Amino acid sequence: MTVKRFIAAPVLGMLILKSLYLQAADTTEHEVRLLIDAIAASHCDFNRNGRQHTAEEAAAHLELKYARAGKRIDSADAFITRLGSSSSFTGKPYLMSCEGDTLPAGEWMIDALEQIRAHTQSLDQSTVSG
């Protein structure tokens, strides 16, 4: 009986940790996909290494970088910092030009991520209360 409890506790703990890890991975994947979709839908110009690209081209580029990075990206914040803010080859920051205003792509994505999280949180709260 004691042996069963001894085995059950670590197994249960591992299952809980795995569940939390999978939830975090699902959240990361979901948030990164929403960020990439937001870029594609933004109609902003994307400056990468001195060259202008459409929003759709920027989204495709970031999608490719994300696919190559794999599990090394453990949060949407890490996606922005490590992949979305600057060129991995030149180190030059990416820029987004939207309606005449230009700002670093990382800043644009942080703002977008805050909006995504606020919207997701309000949906979660309405699901719980409704």
Go through each PLM region and give its residues.
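Bacterial N-terminal signal peptides that target proteins for export
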Residues: 1-10
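Compact alpha-helical subdomains of small soluble proteins
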Residues: 50-130
